[in-house]
């Protein structure tokens, strides 16, 4: 006789009184799914009625399955069965946790188990964000719908976006999650770990040896290690991908959706990018509230009802999801829809670096500017696209006194300047060190001189013999309007720490690098070295 994959531990009838008049009756089944190596994955099954069949919402989480009960009850009321599971090595599940490694194997075993259950009607959809979203991507070819929020299918793009190591994201999350429950590590220890050299022993000094963080540091390039975690473009059914302009997964999430669109092209798939981030914002801005930005939970529920149950087809015509690509324009506080990325409606316009640090329409007089980049005093990242506290838009004025930057500004705007896409820079630079980093920071100067970050980006560059070398930089994408009375501010520097690790200017592998060198950076602009910024401008429709 075939051995059953899961064994029922106990079965509960639950009465939840939401209000004095409203009682929700459901059945909670405590079960387990057996995966490779006879490891048992703790699994909760929520059923409206055990004698009927339902479409299934699958949630696999490293953050304790019981924390999803409120959402599970909400979905029960909408006519779903809900399966919530602790990931391998987390909370009630057996085995050892290694970030991202086992999610496809364990997810496939779980889907096979669901399909054998008498309460399953043939449909299984994924739901969730962040790591829970990744567990969907890992098995997206076996799901009838994917509902993923601020997540990534390609983990290399998350840990090494643009080839730069996501120090704060990796350490903030990786140290905390590397335990069966969650590690209560103090913020002081985490902050200290950012400065530790070599980075490969920062985990030992902070808490304990962390296998997956050590492996991340060892594999700086997109090699077979990262390919094994890459599930980009595999979805067969409709996908709702909700991203944030200040989210750590933004760059990857856009590429994830582009890949799905190219391979799959499902008419029900949608990408929404709103003014959101992966943690509490530093500078509060409601951008007009949910009436303007959209209610993410409601959008996901209607998307699932439309694509899994055949209801609410009007979700595809809403102001937030009416196009394949839907972009919230911050400070304009409305959505712009397109059928492509980059949007064909965007025009690229060049602005040259000019004398007196002004952005000009044509190359100005020849100028050279220098600064010293010292890894012992790296340029601080304030807000932006990282995981932690005080993320997203943040006041940048404390950085204005720093000497390790070149700053260029537009004239005061008399009409709106609307950015939608990537701000790129074509620069002529030199460095006293052969291997270094350059960053581009895009910012908004308000009429009261408050400076807010719009977006950032950068990369490692190689400079031979300190000669003027043309490099290309790109910010992460943004959707942002600078309003009349504001100024566009562009900063070129060599750090954004601790969002990214310090480049030590030696070219050593970051796993073992200890030696620190100071670099003298030079930028050239003018007719012979036409350094420029290219803006993706979206003009208002007449």
Which sequence ranges carry the predicted segments?
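Accessory cap/linker subdomain of secreted extracellular hydrolases
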Residues: 77, 141-234
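Short beta-strand/loop motif that positions the catalytic acidic residue
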Residues: 241-243
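Active-site-adjacent alpha-helix of alpha/beta-hydrolase-fold enzymes
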Residues: 251-269
């Amino acid at each position: 006789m075939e051995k059953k994959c899961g064994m029922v531990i106990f079965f509960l009838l639950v009465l939840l009184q939401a209000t004095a008049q409203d009682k929700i009756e459901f059945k909670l089944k405590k079960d387990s799914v057996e995966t490779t190596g006879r490891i048992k994955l703790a699994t909760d099954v929520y059923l409206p009625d055990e004698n009927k069949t339902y479409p299934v919402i699958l949630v696999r989480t490293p953050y304790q399955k019981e924390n999803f009960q409120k959402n599970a009850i909400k979905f029960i009321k909408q006519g779903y069965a809900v399966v919530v599971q602790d990931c391998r090595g987390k909370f009630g599940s057996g085995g050892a946790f290694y970030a991202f490694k086992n999610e496809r194997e364990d997810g496939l075993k779980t889907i096979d188990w669901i399909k054998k259950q008498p309460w399953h009607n043939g449909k299984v959809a994924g739901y969730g964000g962040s790591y829970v979203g990744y567990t969907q991507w890992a098995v997206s070819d076996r799901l009838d719908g994917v509902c993923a929020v601020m997540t990534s299918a390609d983990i290399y793009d998350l840990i090494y976006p643009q080839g730069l190591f996501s120090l704060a994201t990796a350490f903030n999350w990786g140290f905390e999650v590397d335990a069966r429950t969650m590690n209560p590590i103090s913020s002081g220890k985490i902050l200290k770990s950012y400065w530790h050299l070599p980075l490969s022993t920062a985990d030992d000094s902070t808490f304990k040896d962390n296998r997956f963080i050590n492996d991340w540091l060892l594999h700086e390039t997109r090699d077979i290690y990262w390919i094994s975690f890459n599930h980009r473009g595999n979805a067969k059914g409709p996908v709702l991908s909700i991203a944030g302009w200040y989210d750590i997964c933004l760059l990857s999430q856009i590429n994830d959706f582009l890949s799905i669109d190219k391979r799959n092209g499902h008419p029900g798939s949608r990408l929404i990018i709103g003014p959101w981030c992966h943690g509490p914002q530093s500078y509060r801005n409601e951008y007009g509230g949910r009436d303007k930005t959209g209610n993410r939970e409601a959008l996901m529920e209607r998307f699932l009802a439309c694509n899994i149950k055949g209801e609410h087809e009007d979700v595809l015509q809403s102001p937030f999801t009416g196009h394949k690509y839907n972009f919230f324009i911050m400070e304009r506080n409305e959505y712009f829809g397109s059928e492509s990325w980059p949007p064909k409606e965007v025009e690229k316009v060049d602005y040259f670096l000019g004398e007196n640090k002004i952005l000009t329409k044509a190359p100005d007089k020849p100028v050279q500017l220098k600064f010293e980049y010292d890894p012992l005093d790296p340029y601080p990242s304030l807000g932006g696209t990282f995981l932690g506290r005080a993320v997203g838009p943040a006041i940048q004025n404390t950085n204005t006194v720093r000497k390790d930057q070149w700053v260029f500004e537009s004239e005061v705007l008399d009409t709106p300047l609307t950015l939608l896409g990537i701000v790129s820079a074509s620069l002529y630079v030199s460095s006293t060190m052969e291997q270094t980093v350059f960053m581009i920071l895009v910012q908004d100067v308000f009429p009261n001189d408050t400076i807010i970050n719009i977006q950032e980006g950068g990369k490692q560059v190689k400079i031979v013999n300190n000669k003027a070398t043309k490099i290309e930089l790109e910010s992460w994408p943004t959707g942002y309007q600078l309003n009349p009375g504001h100024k566009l501010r562009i900063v070129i520097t060599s750090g954004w720490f601790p969002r990214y690790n310090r480049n030590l200017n030696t070219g050593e592998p970051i796993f073992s690098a200890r030696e620190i060198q100071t670099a003298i950076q030079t930028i050239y602009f003018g007719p012979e070295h036409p350094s420029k910024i290219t803006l993706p401008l979206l003009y208002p429709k007449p």
